[in-house]
Amino acid sequence: RLPADERWISLMRKSKVLAKLRSGNAARICSMGHFLPFYVRYAAHFRYDAIWLDLEHRAMTDREVQSLLTLCHLSDIDCMVRPPSTERNRLYRYLEDGAAGFLIPFASDAETARRVVEATKFPPLGNRGLDGVGLDGDFGVQGWRKKNADYTLDANRETFVIAQIETPEAVSKVDEIVAVDGIDGLFVGSGDLGLRLALRENATDGDLDSAIQRVAEASTWHGKAWGAASGSLEAIAKYWRMGARVITWGGDYGLRKVLEDCSVQLDSSLCDESDPV
């Protein structure tokens, strides 16, 4: 919670995602699953608010992650980490190394959500271990020296946790999950959720749409942000009209399409009628 004293100042880098969500605007997020330093600069240049760093399905060393988080700070863009596990110390180490927030996979109940908040927020909201001399605290250069500055308040206010809704159980418990203090929003993992919904008895084609609608309603009721993985711009526009503000589009996997197009262009340029490709 912010102190009543208006002279309180913040020394921590402010989250662009949270600034957008708090003002009711869309947080523009692209994704990255490989160690591509140049991609950070490109994302920041093209006005993305955050990079979704996928460590659930991709492997990186700790030093590679630290390097990318440092580049995000230098480029003034948030890094939203999707972690490979919810192990307590691992989570807050990402924050100390500069992550702006988390996208937590398979947050299927309120207990999971509370456990993550416990690990990533300082008291009284959580039980995160205190260091204060990582990248997030400017390595201690200023964080402990300015009057009315408070690293723990900064960290609680300028970092976020978004829970992924990826199972039918999570949909059935969505109100309990989104109501957890310290959960800033929900994000529907359309692939995993759609897979599981389709395996149920009496499944219908509209089950995923109904689940997304349920997430939207619960998030709106509790005053939290939400979003959903989208496979088309039409879906993004639809979710935006439904109130989605966590918007993801674009990723390093898009390089496949770039190379495909370049290959076709090369074929067109190099072939002639007498020597078809």
Model-inferred region functions:
Residues 8-31, 142-157, 213-214, 221:
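N-terminal amphipathic alpha-helix/helix-capping segment at the start of soluble metabolic enzymes
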Residues 21-37, 82-84, 159-172, 225-230:
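Active-site mouth loops of central-metabolism enzymes
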Residues 62-88, 92-96, 120-125, 156, ...:
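Alpha-helix-loop-beta-strand connector modules within alpha/beta enzyme cores
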